[in-house]
Amino acid sequence: MLTLRLIVAAVFLISGGNQLKADDSFTCPVTKASEQTFVPPALWGAGPWYGTEKLWTRVEMWEHWRKDELGYYVPKLAWFSSTFDWTPEHWPKERLLTITGRRLDGPSKPLIFETANNAYMPGRPFITASVHLPTAGCWEITGHSKGETLTFVVEIVP
């Protein structure tokens, strides 16, 4: 049994660990800001934005993926909502936001969602959140907040 475990561990390490094989014929349907006509309140400035009045994000943030010490791709994403109130007396008892995701172009370990936090710039409350994606590839990511969902597709190139 120990021999089998060592063989499995060796194959995992030799294969690149987290990097599972993608489907080479797959074309990632990356979400573009132009697919959306949403314009947030003027105080947020020019886009590119994606979403609805109740939940939106900034498209250019999807392009910044760094690797952490374990080899996961970790973006910091900002999420916005016209209904979000950052003051402590209005914080919901449940989570502000949860994020789920799945790889579209091949097998992968699951996305890891840490937590969402409130954030604030003068007159502009928002939510920050981090996810850990175990592999490069084509990912569908969905934010869930107060019954609203927002889904987009990104391609992470190693």
Segments predicted by a language model, with ranges:
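Bacterial N-terminal signal peptides
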Residues: 5-15
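Contiguous segments within soluble domain cores/interaction surfaces
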Residues: 20-134, 138-158
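N-terminal secretory signal peptides that target proteins for export/translocation
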Residues: 1-2
